[in-house]
Design a protein with these regions (language model features):
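Conserved, function-critical positions that sit in or immediately flank catalytic
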Residues: 134-212
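Structured soluble/peripheral alpha/beta segments that form catalytic or ligand/cofactor-binding pockets
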Residues: 6-7, 11-133, 211-450
Length: 450
């Protein structure tokens, strides 16, 4: 199975005034977006939208255990329009200079059901599920690709581990006969320990191992933005280090309505339903977080203020995936902001030191939304040793309307999810500079799908 680009992010470029009626496009005092223009309705829109071709809940941010700083991402996504779900989970341990990550695909009908993987009924408790916490087979990792295997006569068998019914298929390089990947089409059930993976065929040398990873999100009916229980496990792709998150998350204040309205129209309305033609987006940017992170058996009690995105609707195609650059900031003065630059139309990949126009959505401490133009400058290029993609580790963001200059700096260089296609950079960053003419600082995030 060829892994498709796993993209999430700030949708599509369009003229600022057209996208957000009432948005300020000058350097005069920015005008707030009227609250009545928002199409987001909570708690209903916190739930699954079963007709949406794409949907995800994405938790990121900075957590601390005393002086020890961690960046994390827990992303559960459904691309039912392309026939799969996926998770991306990562942890950056800044002091140890370590980054743990894994991307996992889930295929229907046994791996995930796009109609039931999350709760759609607003009269029930909210939940999201990818993977099974109680069965230790979620994916299969090729540890040695071997050579000489026949694409039509190679089988994968799952044995032991106390479970049954697992089914897996190999993807074989037709030229070399190497096992490129193994797709687990049915994870089976009841695997209380990692099962053995056996590859048979006329080739030789290929080996693989079982991987356990999962995401669960739960909250009580009524206001599911409160006391969200997010539990997740990743088995690091490079080292097999196990990382477990057990977090409780509660939003304080109003949601962050992206674009001020929460929606942008992508395709002609007559070409499908509103979920098939529009992109819907809101965030929770003042999330009080507490819980534990366990790294290879070592437990850290953590707290912090984190960020959640919920996006659903139309989001590109496999043939024309969206590419973008994004920075998020949660400032100590109570403001939150998200800047994005979409690589589409006349927007090309910026060169180091080249200022480019961008669009910034901001929220003040009282919850009022603003959308203004900005200028973004990328610096400090870094080449991923895994994918060969060149990312930027520093960004300067100038927001004239708010007399602001913010500098985002990645706290660790290597924070990539490397993939055969569609690698993406997701990383903890600092955010420092000035805002409304006064010194400002806070936690930051850098995202790059290039």
């Amino acid at each position: 199975m060829t892994i498709l680009p796993f993209l999430r992010g700030r949708g599509f470029a369009r003229p600022l005034a057209q996208a957000c009626p009432g948005a300020d496009t000058h350097t005069d005092a920015p005008q707030p977006i009227p609250r009545e223009l928002s199409v987001i309705r909570l708690p209903a829109d916190h739930y699954l939208h079963r007709d949406a071709p794409t949907e995800w809940w994405w938790h990121i941010g900075t957590l601390k255990a005393g002086d020890r700083v961690f960046g994390f991402e827990i992303n559960a996504a459904s691309f039912q329009g392309r026939g799969f779900g996926f998770s991306q989970i990562m942890l950056t341990d800044v002091a140890a200079k370590k980054h743990y990550q894994r991307t996992t695909t889930f295929t229907p009908p046994a791996g995930y059901d796009p109609a039931t993987w999350a709760e759609h009924d607003v009269n029930r408790d909210w939940r999201v599920r990818l993977g099974d916490p109680n069965s230790r087979l979620t994916a299969i990792k090729v540890t040695n690709p071997g050579s000489g295997y026949d694409p039509l006569a190679t089988t994968v068998t799952v044995t032991g581990g106390g479970g049954s019914q697992a089914i897996a298929w190999p993807l074989v390089d037709p030229t070399t006969g190497a096992i490129l990947s193994i797709q687990l089409t049915n994870p089976g059930r009841g695997y209380t320990s990692p099962p053995h993976i056996v590859i048979t065929g006329k080739g030789s040398g290929a080996t693989a191992e079982a991987v356990h990873t999962f995401i669960t999100m739960d909250a009580a009916w009524g206001d599911p933005t409160q006391n969200m229980a997010v539990v997740s496990k990743l088995t690091d792709d490079a080292t097999d280090t196990e990382v477990v998150f057990d977090l409780t998350l509660s939003q304080k204040g109003a949601p962050f309505v992206v674009w001020g309205t929460g929606v942008t129209q992508i395709l002609p309305p007559a070409s499908g339903s509103h979920l098939q033609t529009g992109n819907y987006y809101y965030s929770l940017t003042n999330v009080a977080a507490s819980g534990t992170i366990t790294i290879d058996g070592e437990i850290f009690e953590v707290t912090g203020k984190t960020w959640m995105d919920h996006e659903y609707g139309f989001f590109g195609t496999a043939q024309n995936p969206v590419k973008w650059i994004l920075q998020n900031a949660q400032l100590d003065n109570g403001w939150s902001l998200s800047n994005h630059y979409v690589l589409a139309g006349g927007n090309k990949r910026p060169n180091p030191g080249e200022p480019v126009p961008c669009e910034v959505t901001l929220q003040d401490p009282e919850g009022q939304m603003y959308v203004v133009p900005g200028v973004m400058t990328a610096e400090r290029p870094w080449t991923s040793p895994a994918s060969g993609v060149v990312y930027y580790l520093d960004y300067q963001l100038d927001i004239a309307g708010f007399d602001a200059v913010l500098n985002f700096k990645a706290l660790l260089a290597d924070q990539e999810f490397p993939l055969p296609t569609g690698s993406i950079y997701e990383g903890i960053a600092s955010a420092e500079g000035s805002f409304q003419g006064k010194p400002a600082s806070g936690t930051g995030w850098i995202e790059q799908a290039l």
